[in-house]
Every structure is written in C-alpha cells, then in structure tokens.
C-alpha cells in the first residue's frame, strides 16, 4: 500500500493583524523555553550519553501536535517527537483522558520513529486547570531497556530490541504511578542510570510546561494562537523560498548500506525527488522490502530524516517549527525498508536515516551546482560498551559515538572531527570515559590523509584506540566501510570508516558486530571517515597545501598524488 504524509497544519490567515514585533517576542520565548528544557536535562542527567554526548531532543508542541519549537540538540529527532506526542495521547484514550499533572512514557519504535532505547516523556500543559494549550516532550537515549544486549546490530524482530512502553501514564494528576516505575526498574541492566536520566527528563518537561504557561498567561491565549499561525507561516516561507530555486522536475539517486546486520551483502535503495514550484515530494516507494536485520526505518523516522535534510538546507539558521515541514510530502510503500510493518527489527534505523540525508543532497548537488557539500564520513562510528563491573560487582554500560570529517563545500574546507551533520552529538572528554569505565584511551588523533582532496579539502576523521582494563563487551555500529565518502564537482573521495579488534591472536575488522568480548589488555581501534573534497584538486592554492603539510593534516605522498601543481617555497 502506498502512503503519503504531510504536516497536519491546516491554518487560514489569522483573522486579526498581529504586531510582528510581538510575534517575534513570542517565537523567541518559545525557543528559549525549549532551550530551558535542554539545559535542565543536561544539568541533572545521570549518564554522559545525555549530558556530554547530547543524545536527546526537547520540544514544545501545540494542542494539535504541531511543533512550536525544538532545542538545537539532536536534529535526527526532528519530527519524530510529534509522532511520539500524538501516539502517546492516543494510547491513553485521547485528549479527554488527560488531566493536569499527567505525564506519559512512550518508546514504541513504530510510533516514535526511534529505537526502543530512545524514551519519550510527554507532558500535557494546561491553563485555568482544564484548558489544554499544548505539550512538552523530551526524548532521550536510555543506556539499556532490557533487549538481548544493551545495543544490537543483529536483531530479527522488535521484541529483541528492548522493553516497549506503549504510552503509559507515569504520573496521574501529579502522582507517581508506582507500578509503571517498578516496571522500568525491573527491565534494565543499569536501573540507577535509567532512573537518574528519567528524573532529569521529568524535570525538563516540567520546566518547559511552566515556561509555556507563562507565555500564554502573559499574552493571552487568543493572541498566542494568532502569533503561532504567523510563526508557522514564517517557517513555511523560508523553506518554500529555497525549494522554489530548484528547477521543476523529477530527480533520483541511489544510496546503500554495508549490510542489514543479519544477512550478508550491500542493501541498495532508491530515492526520488519531485519538485513542483515550492512543493516537494520525497518518494521512498521504490525502496527494497523490509529487511531481516534492524536497518528498517518506521514511517516517523523516514519523515524525520526528510525534515532534517530540508530544514538544514533552507532554515537559514533558524530553530525549526512546524511551518518548515508544510511544503514537504513524503511518499512510502508499506512493507518496505522505509515503511516497515511491525515486528520488523528497526534498532539501527538511525544509521539508514543518516544515509538518506546525504543521498538527498547528492541527488540535488548534481542538478544545482555550488550549493550542496560533499559527503561526510557518513556515520556516527559508534560503540556501546558494557560489563559486569569487576571492581564493585555492579553492571555498567556506556556509549561513545566518534566524530568524522565533514564534506567540503563551495567556499571552504570541511570541518574536521565533528559528528554527522544530522546527529548534533559530541564526543565525551577522555577524563569522563576513563573515570567511569574500565578502559584507557591510548590514542585520539586526527587521521592524516583521511580527507578527500579538492579545491577545498574535506575534514579529517579520527584514529582512536581503547585498551581494556577488565573483561568488557562492545557492540560496534559503523557504516560506510564498503564505499568511500564522495566528492562533489570533481572533488576526490575520502577515507572510509573502519573498526579493528586488536587481540593477542591478531587483528580483525569488526565494523558492525554485537557483543564482542574484549579481554583485559586487548584493544579496539576506530578509524573514522573523512569528508569528501569539493572542486578540482588542481585548483587548490599553494598556500593552503603548504599549511596542511605544516599542520600534518596531509603527507608529502598525499600531495604528490593529489596536488601535482604544488611548488615548494621557502618558509
């Protein structure tokens, strides 16, 4: 069955003129409220995956589940939280069953668009005790929800991936529901961490609710609603302005994944883009059938990645709102990789989504020159670690996404050592890693020659090495090992990602493996990809090549291979 999805905004022009200055004040107040939620979570979270890596998103929604504001944290969650909010409200019986002080827990992948370890906390917001004005929500990564491992690349159904909380009231009228709380504790290997992070999320949604109430009470609900219409209109105009610059027509391209995590072999997928004026359709209906392994993307995830791509492209640096999404139509076919049917596994849907964003840009870069960057390293190059805790006999778990090089663009070199452009996460400090986990960080270095050559070179990837101080298990999740990050406008490809297990019996490539056992003294090495180059390398200036040599970003051999025009000069 073919399905289409579009933002549910259905507004007419506001009936009264609203002071544009007041609209801006309310818009920025909403952005500030979402940022306050973010700061509250960071300051009170238990796990580094939240307060250092920033694997979360906080947002505010109107009563129709349209996004008023989202904090600048994890763009990959953009658009999925609205699905979470709507699904969680539906699961508890609809708006009529909501009361002031209710808080809902939701993590069903098919309603949230994330894997089950991304748990959403949703709070309806009221004024005058019974007038619903909107919702606050925070989705954050929990270290373990009771799946077959704390993180898996080889699940064959959604039930292996963790406990599903399909919209449960954690608080009713301000009172904790003890049975739900006990259920959460009983279904995690690291309950202290989960409860600590849950409490931080609760603080965050409450802070956002208070802020939203202050805004509405200060300006009045009618003025607030009219201003919101103007805010959505502004967001829509921004995106339509960019889309209208794309020539009308149908464009298409292919992406691929190294494997689906269970079966051997590359998984290729096709995306079509149809442009008509300022309207744009992203067509995923020719995707392969849903996969046996966990790279399937539930509909909310597919919608989210499309929204991220065009918000970054057209958002002009503004924090997004629902208006950004109105010009976009997403078309899928049920039962395929980008619209699977439960219980198909989907734990790694985020990795497929990362490829979607860059394939969209690749397709458009071939039609619209000088706008889109070259490919990044294309992956989070992540690891999730766990163990029994030999020193204190307490199980532990942690996650570590590793930065990559970003693609070069028209006018500049790619950014070095930064997480994927749709992830927005960051690397934990070495001191945090070593103080909380039984390993030593032997190496974190910029990877010489990992960048793609060009008039503007790509960013560099990293080389990292972790040495185990006790028996440890790790799941590695690394894509783009079989095909390198591409260049644009005759720019060259960059180094691909790879992971190497270093044991007493030798070295082994392990880019996508679940539950690898590492003994004391063994190490694992991550080699993250660089960014592709932009423009012909022959056009790169002597000055820039010389500076790259001085900084040891590239070697003499690299220069000889890619920059034959280089002339040595006296320093």
Predicted regions mapped to residue ranges:
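Glycine/proline-enriched, intrinsically flexible loops and inter-domain linkers
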Residues: 2-100, 105-128, 132-281, 285-570
């Amino acid at each position: 069955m073919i399905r289409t999805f579009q933002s549910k905004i259905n507004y007419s022009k506001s009936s009264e003129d609203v002071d544009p200055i007041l609209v801006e004040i309310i818009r920025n107040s909403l952005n500030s409220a979402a940022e306050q939620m973010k700061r509250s979570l960071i300051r009170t979270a238990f796990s580094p995956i939240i307060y250092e890596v920033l694997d979360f998103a906080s947002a505010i929604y109107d009563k129709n589940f349209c996004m008023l504001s989202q904090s600048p944290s994890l763009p990959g969650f953009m658009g999925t939280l609205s699905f979470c909010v709507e699904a969680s409200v539906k699961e508890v019986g609809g708006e009529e069953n909501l009361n002031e002080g209710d808080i809902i827990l939701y993590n069903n992948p098919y309603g949230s668009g994330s894997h089950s370890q991304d748990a959403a906390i949703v709070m309806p917001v009221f004024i005058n005790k019974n007038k619903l004005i909107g919702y606050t929500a925070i989705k954050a990564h929990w270290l373990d929800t009771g799946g077959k491992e704390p993180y898996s690349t080889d699940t064959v159904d959604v039930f292996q991936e963790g406990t599903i909380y399909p919209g449960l009231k954690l608080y009713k009228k301000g009172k904790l529901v003890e049975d739900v709380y006990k259920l959460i504790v009983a279904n995690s290997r690291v309950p202290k961490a989960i409860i600590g992070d849950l409490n931080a999320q609760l603080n965050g949604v409450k802070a956002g609710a208070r802020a939203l109430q202050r805004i509405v009470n200060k300006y009045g609900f009618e003025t607030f609603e009219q201003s919101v219409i103007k805010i959505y209109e502004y967001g829509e105009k921004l995106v339509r302005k960019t889309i209208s610059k794309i020539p009308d027509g149908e464009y298409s391209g292919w992406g691929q994944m190294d494997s689906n995590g269970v079966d051997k072999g590359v998984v290729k997928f096709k995306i079509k883009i149809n442009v008509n004026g300022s309207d744009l359709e992203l067509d995923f209906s020719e995707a392969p059938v849903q996969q046996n392994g966990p790279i399937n993307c539930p509909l909310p995830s597919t919608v989210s990645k499309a929204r991220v791509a065009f918000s970054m492209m057209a958002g002009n640096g503004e924090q997004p709102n629902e208006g950004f999404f109105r010009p976009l139509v997403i078309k899928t076919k049920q039962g395929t990789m980008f619209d699977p049917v439960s219980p198909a596994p989907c734990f790694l849907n985020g990795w497929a989504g990362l490829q979607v964003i860059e394939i969209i840009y690749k397709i458009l870069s071939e039609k619209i020159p000088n706008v889109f960057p070259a490919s990044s390293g294309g992956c989070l190059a992540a690891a999730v670690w766990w163990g029994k805790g030999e020193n204190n006999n307490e199980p532990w778990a942690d996650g570590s996404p590793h930065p990559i090089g970003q693609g070069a663009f028209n006018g500049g070199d790619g950014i070095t050592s930064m997480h994927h452009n749709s992830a927005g996460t960051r690397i934990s400090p070495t001191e945090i890693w070593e103080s909380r986990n039984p390993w030593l960080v032997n190496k974190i270095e910029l990877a010489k020659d990992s960048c793609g050559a060009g008039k503007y070179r790509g960013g560099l990837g990293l080389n990292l090495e972790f040495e185990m101080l006790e028996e440890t298990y790790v799941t590695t999740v690394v894509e783009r090992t079989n095909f390198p990050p591409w260049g644009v406008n005759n720019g060259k490809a960059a180094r691909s990602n790879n992971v190497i297990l270093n044991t007493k019996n030798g070295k082994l490539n392990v880019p996508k493996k679940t539950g690898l056992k590492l003994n004391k003294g063994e190490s694992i090495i991550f080699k993250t990809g660089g960014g592709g180059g932009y423009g012909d390398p022959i056009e790169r200036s002597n000055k820039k090549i010389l500076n790259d040599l001085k900084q040891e970003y590239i070697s003499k051999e690299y220069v000889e291979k890619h920059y034959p025009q280089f002339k040595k000069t006296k320093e």
